[in-house]
Swiss-Prot record:
Phylogenetic classification of the source organism: Bacteria, Bacillati, Bacillota, Clostridia, Thermoanaerobacterales
Gene name in the database record: coaX
Pfam families, per the entry: Pan_kinase (PF03309)
Keywords attached to this entry: ATP-binding, Coenzyme A biosynthesis, Cytoplasm, Kinase, Metal-binding, Nucleotide-binding, Potassium, Transferase
Protein name per its UniProtKB record: Type III pantothenate kinase
GO molecular function: ATP binding; metal ion binding; pantothenate kinase activity
Organism, as annotated: Carboxydothermus hydrogenoformans (strain ATCC BAA-161 / DSM 6008 / Z-2901)
Subunit relationships: Homodimer.
Amino acid sequence: MFLAIDIGNTNIVLGIYDKGKLIKTWRMAADRNKTVDEYAVLIHNFFSFINLSFKDIEGIGIASVVPPLTPIFEQLCYNYFKVKPLVIGPGVRTGLKIKFENPREVGADRIVNAVAGYHIYGGPLIVVDFGTATTFDAINDKGEYIGGAISPGIGISTEALFARASKLPRIELVKPLSVIGKNTVSAMQAGIIYGFIGQVDEICARMKKELGGAAKVIATGGLAELIATDSRQIEKVDQNLTLEGIRLIYERNQAGN
């Protein structure tokens, strides 16, 4: 079996693959203060739900955008799984040509999304990932990663609003019935949700134009469903895109050994 580990700033997502098929995913908070052993206990508990043990895992791939957590999970793989993980980064075979001024600046999450997106949906393609930051990544019809855009994510944007505007209450991020709010809560929900929908649609429309007008738009990440339902640009939500990219890159590197 194969274990894909997606380490983000807010959450860590685990995916178990059996013969190339995703059979289970789990999500846990990304905590830089946790030790190797503490994370091992959490993973062991997850595994116990499906009668899985550490020794069942034959390969591990890691995509991380949190440098302090990367060595913790590498050590966890050595200590508990007795497996050397593939950490996706510079020097790893991805099968993706990166046409970026400095390819090393492109985050592992964006690379794996691009790899999986092009493999599954073809190109030209735009991948929108709703994480701590909202990222937009463009892949042309040749399967080349040509760049993208990064904006503050919905979560950190709303946190900034709550922190700076002391009279505004904390709210649940749900779509209001109307864009014209009738109270403070619904007005905030309208501004945040429809504001982000507008941002996504505008950036994607401009990217499509630069890509030649026919690009597909695929979304992933925690709040993708919330935004996609009213977006004029997003065609599909694929919540397993990042895990699938980790698996694909791992397999490409195994094939080359």
